């Protein structure tokens, strides 16, 4: 039952029970109040009064969203935004046409096929609404850069011995390819194996156990002692969601880990020596050496490592229906599309502009556009208290009563929250630039449905989605969760001293767990596996200078996890998140101990991101 519907049901039940008591005292009213099938007009009046009193009760118990929403929008706006559907896009280069590496940049727009008969196949008599929704193409934006090269992976094989681990990755290139046409530093692997155990174990071995590598082509051997694998997803250029500059990346990493952990199974090859001119590139093997054998039960296949893959997210720019403010309303409905309301949802309001009516011909075209400032920003102008002149726009949201998600509106206010008069608008027509999603439609797509380019697409490659888009997630509207989030953002050293406090902070960021009971149960089991937490100050030398930082040790029970690799991935995410708790010019280092095997992993020191002022 929806949060708002609960109040209505409780108030209606209270009125009906009260009606039965009143009918006992006044029997002549029993026909109207006590009987279930009584007077329909009285029933409608009771339902209307229950709706009004339920709305009033909800307002009294809503935990002051006027305060929490404004504060969260300035500190971490993505918590109040929906998490769109996400998927992985794989490109298939035409190796005979590629002469040099071709880059496909992030923010490239792609879409699904417009005609989707499978969307209405389950209904015997689909109505016109279903036909409209099925004809809307879902637009996705590439989240990361990708380089296309005339290379393919033929096979991935576990060649481990009793002393060391070995993985052989066999490549093939076009017969006309030369070493000058290839750049191995631009290779990105995606651990696309459907076996979660294998991909998590590979993640652990790639990050912790890699010693060196070599290229093998027949009798030709080229040592690569400096090669290493960089885990993707932690740098700001790897962000899936649009991220405000004033928000620390640790929040982003934690949110993306809970909402789409698939984005962290990408690795970049780094520090690979250039290929010699006489190296045979038509068929060669990259051999990775590890300091211990790989587990015997991992299953390596041809698709265990995939090339030319990148995450994509269901976000795109769109313009809202025009708004003409007149100063008579406190807020105005903000709709992405009046024609297709169930096909578009607002993720973010980017800019608000209007055309200024200028008399004469001396003004330049650029001066005819008015850019309205945002109310929840750090760009308020200095004004005298009784001479408010600047008008700001304010994006407001509330839970929708008619569909999943939020209802959006836009208000125009002065800095003190007062509503400006009609003379401030001059009959302006407001144009609102949005970043939108396609609501629930992407969740109905299947593998291979996203395969159409919108703008420019390399003529030397085709693409398609190789994973089914995830289910969109709506923001949590519970006021208690908002206050918990604000408390979690109050970064201090004490948060790393108590186990229960840390677990509560992590649960606050678990948006899938707030929507799916099964995901919440699994997440709770994994967080409860943190048996002990210890944080203490430490001193280490950096370039000969002693620097004081924080060292945190976690003791984790491995039972709820798939394998040790899943624990290691969680630790990698936490090492970036804990850097928020160390001040600038300081650092934080994390250590995790497996309580069963007593194996320990320690991450490199992360420089502090918590400003002192």
Functional labels for PLM-detected ranges:
Residues 1-24, 29, 36, 228-277, ...:
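Mixed-charge (acidic/basic) macromolecular-recognition segments
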Residues 1-220:
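Extended assembly-interface regions of large multimeric machines
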Residues 28, 360-613:
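C-terminal domain/tail detector
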Residues 41, 53-60, 78, 153-164, ...:
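Extracellular ectodomain segments of secreted/surface proteins
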Residues 48-49, 70-72, 153, 202-210, ...:
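Generic hydrophobic, helix-prone segments enriched in Leu/Val/Ile
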Residues 51-60, 66-79, 84-100, 114, ...:
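Short linear motifs embedded in intrinsically disordered, proline/glycine-rich low-complexity segments
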Residues 148-158, 227-232, 286, 463, ...:
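Generic structural motif
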Residues 176-382, 387-390:
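Short, low-complexity Pro/Thr/Gly
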């Amino acid at each position: 039952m929806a949060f708002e519907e609960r109040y209505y049901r409780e108030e209606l039940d209270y009125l009906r029970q009260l009606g039965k008591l009143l009918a006992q005292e006044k029997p002549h009213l029993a026909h109207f109040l006590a009987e279930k099938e009584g007077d329909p007009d009285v029933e409608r009046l009771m339902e209307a009064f229950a709706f009004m009193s339920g709305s009033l009760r909800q307002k009294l118990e809503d935990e002051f969203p006027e305060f929490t929403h404004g504060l969260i929008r300035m500190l971490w706006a993505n918590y109040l935004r929906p998490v769109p559907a996400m998927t992985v896009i794989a490109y298939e280069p035409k190796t005979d046409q590629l002469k040099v590496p071709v880059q496909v940049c992030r923010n490239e727009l792609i879409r699904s096929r417009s005609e989707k008969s499978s969307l209405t196949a389950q209904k015997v008599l689909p109505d016109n609404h279903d036909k409209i929704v099925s004809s809307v193409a879902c637009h996705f934006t590439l989240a990361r850069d990708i380089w296309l090269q005339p290379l393919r992976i033929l096979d991935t094989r576990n060649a481990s011995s009793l002393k060391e681990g070995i993985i052989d990755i066999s490549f093939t290139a076009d017969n006309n390819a030369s070493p000058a046409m290839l750049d191995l530093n631009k290779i990105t692997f995606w651990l696309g194996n459907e076996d979660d155990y294998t991909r998590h174990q590979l993640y652990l071995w790639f990050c912790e156990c890699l010693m060196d590598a070599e290229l093998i082509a027949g009798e030709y051997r080229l040592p690569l002692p400096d090669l290493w694998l960089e885990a993707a997803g932690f740098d700001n250029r790897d962000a899936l969601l649009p991220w405000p500059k004033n928000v620390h990346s640790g929040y982003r990493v934690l949110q993306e880990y809970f909402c789409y952990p698939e984005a962290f199974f990408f690795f970049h090859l780094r520090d690979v020596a250039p290929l010699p001119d006489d190296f045979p590139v038509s068929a060669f093997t990259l051999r990775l050496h590890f300091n211990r054998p790989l587990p015997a039960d991992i299953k390596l296949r041809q698709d265990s490592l995939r090339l030319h893959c990148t995450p994509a997210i269901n976000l795109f720019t769109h313009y809202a229906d025009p708004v003409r403010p007149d100063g008579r309303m406190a807020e105005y409905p903000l709709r992405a599309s009046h024609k297709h309301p169930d096909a578009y949802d607002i993720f973010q309001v980017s800019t608000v502009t209007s055309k200024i009516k200028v008399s004469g011909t001396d003004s330049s075209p650029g001066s005819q556009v008015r850019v309205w400032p945002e109310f929840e920003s750090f760009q308020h102008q200095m004004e005298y208290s009784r001479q408010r002149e600047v008008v700001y726009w304010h994006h407001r949201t509330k839970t929708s009563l008619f569909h999943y998600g939020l209802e959006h509106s836009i208000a125009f206010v002065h800095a003190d929250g007062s509503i400006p008069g009609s003379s401030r608008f001059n009959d302006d027509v407001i144009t609102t630039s949005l970043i939108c999603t396609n609501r629930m439609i992407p969740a109905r797509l299947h593998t291979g449905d996203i395969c159409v380019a919108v703008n420019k697409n390399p003529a030397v490659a085709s693409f398609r989605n190789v994973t089914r888009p995830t289910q969109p997630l709506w923001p949590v509207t519970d006021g208690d969760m908002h206050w918990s989030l604000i408390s979690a953002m109050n970064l201090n050293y004490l948060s790393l001293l108590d186990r229960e406090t840390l677990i509560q902070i992590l649960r606050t960021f678990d948006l899938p767990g707030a929507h799916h009971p099964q995901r919440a149960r699994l997440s709770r089991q994994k967080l409860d596996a943190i048996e002990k937490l210890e944080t203490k100050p430490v001193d280490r030398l950096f370039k000969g200078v002693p620097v004081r930082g924080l060292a945190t040790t976690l003791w984790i029970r491995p039972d709820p996890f798939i394998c040790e690799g899943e624990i290691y991935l969680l630790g990698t995410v936490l090492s970036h998140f804990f850097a928020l708790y160390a001040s600038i010019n300081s650092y934080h280092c994390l250590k995790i101990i497996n309580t069963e095997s007593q194996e320990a992993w320690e991450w490199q020191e992360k420089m502090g991101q918590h400003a002192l002022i």
